[in-house]
From Swiss-Prot:
GO cellular component, one term: secretory granule
Lineage: Eukaryota, Metazoa, Chordata, Craniata, Vertebrata
Positions of disulphide bridges: C16-C60, C19-C33, C27-C50, C34-C40, C67-C79, C80-C85
Keyword line: Amidation, Cleavage on pair of basic residues, Disulfide bond, Hormone
Subunit structure: Interacts with oxytocin receptor (Ki=1.5 nM). Interacts with vasopressin V1aR/AVPR1A (Ki=37 nM), V1bR/AVPR1B (Ki=222 nM), and V2R/AVPR2 receptors (Ki=823 nM).
Organism listed in the record: Papio hamadryas
Gene that encodes it: OXT
A molecular-function term among this protein's GO annotations: V1A vasopressin receptor binding
A Pfam family it matches: Hormone_5
Protein name as catalogued: Oxytocin-neurophysin 1
């Protein structure tokens, strides 16, 4: 319906940066990179690119569904927030 939660387009939320081997993953936080086939990398070299998110002006979102307390579904049923999985 007009004026409902879905009335305004989500122009301010973009996909988070790609990361990990071959750029197959997505950043879930400044130190977290999750890739469908590989799982999640936390605080490793694969997640280093995710620190760039701190310097970008617009917010981003990874994962399809919300889970836990402010998290998003990552891989293999794992729920990740910017602080951890």
């Amino acid at each position: 319906p007009l004026g409902g939660k879905r009335a305004a387009p989500d122009l301010d939320v973009r996909k988070c940066l790609p990361c990990g081997p071959g750029g197959k993953g997505r950043c879930f936080g400044p130190n977290i990179c999750c890739a469908e086939e590989l799982g999640c990398f936390v605080g490793t070299a694969e997640a280093l690119r995710c620190q760039e998110e701190n310097y970008l002006p617009s917010p981003c979102q990874s994962g399809q569904k919300a889970c836990g307390s402010g998290g998003r579904c990552a891989v293999f049923g794992l729920c990740c927030s910017p602080d951890g999985c």
